[in-house]
Amino acid sequence: MRLLEIVRSDATGNDVIASAFALAKKIRKIGVLSKVCFGFIGNRMMDPYAREAQRLVLEGATPAQVDSALENFGMAMGILAVFDMAGVDVGVKVRKANPQQGSSDPSFYRADAVLFGQNWIGQKTGKGYYRYEQGSRERHPHPEAQALLAEEAKKLGIAQRTDITEQEIVERCIYSMINEGAKILEEGVALRPGDIDVVYTSGYGFPRRRGGPMFFADEIGLSTVLAGIEKYGKRLHAEDWQPAPLLKKLAAENGTFAAWHAARSKKG
């Protein structure tokens, strides 16, 4: 990974920031400045993205179906395969240590919790969202996991669907990521939309041909993104689909994140 997120607190001096960027250049990393928040830029935006992927498998999509849709969009690796590679247990422990970052939706990251309960934590145990042969990273279907997730969905009152499309998978995962990015911009955690795009194209496998999540949002139109967020918010957990105020404002003005940043820069 070439990305190096450089995190600035209120007490961090400019000389320290300059030294950090110089170090990034020396070790051939791409430095991006972030303010302090849970997950900084990259992991904070990955949280809703992965939330939707996990919810989709509870609704009846297979892990391969979810990951294939994201990889066809251009992501370097589907998010469920990423969890298997990193370890399902890592995310479970992070959420346990930071319960305030959760949701009132009982399905929130339940897929991870179910797999963790079976010690199916990914490649290091040979089973996770997928099954792996010893010494291999090749993904194979894991029917036991899918059956257990279907049982969990039934307990949660989540109906199994057969009509989940590739378009829905991409929209739910990518639009929720963009929405979080808009919140990050408005809070000043990231200085500019381009910084978010660099984080995602340099460190999180977002397709360079699409420019990054915020550039992609500008390209397809913020009104399109907002309409999708509002649509899914009506039939999913509304709390998790609240549109970012900045996204609503710019969509109403037929604006873009890039133009918003340019206007702010001119004001100094």
Question: What is each PLM-predicted segment?
Answer:
Residues M1-G268:
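N-terminal glycine-rich phosphate-binding loop for ADP-containing cofactors
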